Amino acid sequence: MNQFRIVADSSCDLLTLDGADFVSVPLSIRTDTEEFCDDANLDVDAMVSTLRETKGRSYSACPNIADWESAFGESGNVIAFTITSALSGSYNAACVAKKNCEERNPARRICVVDSLSAGPEIALLIERALYELRSHADFDKVCEALNTYQAHTHLLFALESMHNLAQNGRVSKLAATMASVLGIRAIGQASAEGTLEMLGKCRGVRKARQFMLSEMVELGYKGGKVRIGHCQNAALALELCTEIQQRFPEADVRSYPLRGLCSYYAERGGIMLGFES
C-alpha cells in the first residue's frame, strides 16, 4: 500500500508504534484546579496520586477537531482509532476532521474507527491494522478486515478504586466508598454499545483474577492475543499473564503500565485486559 499513517487518541496507551508512521492524539484529565495532558511528558504516577487526594470533580476532555486534523496530516491514507463514543466526544471530533481533510484532498482515504472500548482492546485493533495495511493493497479491504476483527475483540477490567468514577458522576459516591472500605473489586467489561458494564464484585485479588479468567473463556477466548494494562499493579498483571500462558501455552500475552487517560479510569491497582475470541 502507498503511504499510510495510524492515528489514535491517547486512550490506546501507545506513544510510538514500531515500523509505522504513528501519531497519538492526547486527551486531558482535568480538575477544578489542574490539567494533565496525556502525552509523553505526563508523569502518570504523580497524576494518580494527585487525583486520589482530589475532593472536587474531575473529568476527561477529548481532542478537538483541529487536533485530529493536525494528526491526520496533509497527505496519505489514515486509519484512526478513538476511545468509545459512549464515554467521549473524541470519535465525533475525529469524524469531522476526516470530512474536512477529505474535502481538501479528495484523493485521500481516512477511516475512523469507534473502538467502543479503550486501552488494551484498542492496542489489539492497532496491531491488526498494521498487519492488514502491510498485507493488502486495497484500503477498503483493510477497513473491512479490521471491522471483522473488531467483532472478535473484548475488554475486561478490574477496579480496586472507583474514586474518580464517583468524582465525575459515573458511579455513586456511596458505592465507591463502600467498595473501598470493604476491599471489593468491581469487575466489568466494555459492552457491545461501548458502555461500562459491571459484571460482578469480588473481595480479594485471587477471586478477582479467577473471575476475569472465567469471563475470558465465557466470551470465547481460546488462546489468542492478550494485552494487559495496569495502573500501579504489575504484580496482578504478571499473575494474569502467567496463568493465561499456563492454560494456553501458545498465547501471545503482554502487559504494560497504562498511560494517563486509562489510569484515570482504572485508578491505582486497576487492570484492563483486552483479548481475542
Question: Each predicted region: which residue ranges?
Answer:
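Rossmann-fold dehydrogenase core element
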Residues: P106
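Class I S-adenosyl-L-methionine
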Residues: E34-E103
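Generic enzyme active-site microenvironment
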Residues: V7
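Mixed-charge interfacial surface used for oligomerization/domain docking
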Residues: N2-Q3, S11-I29, T33-E34, L87-S90, ...
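A glycine-rich beta-strand to alpha-helix segment
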Residues: T82, C111-V112
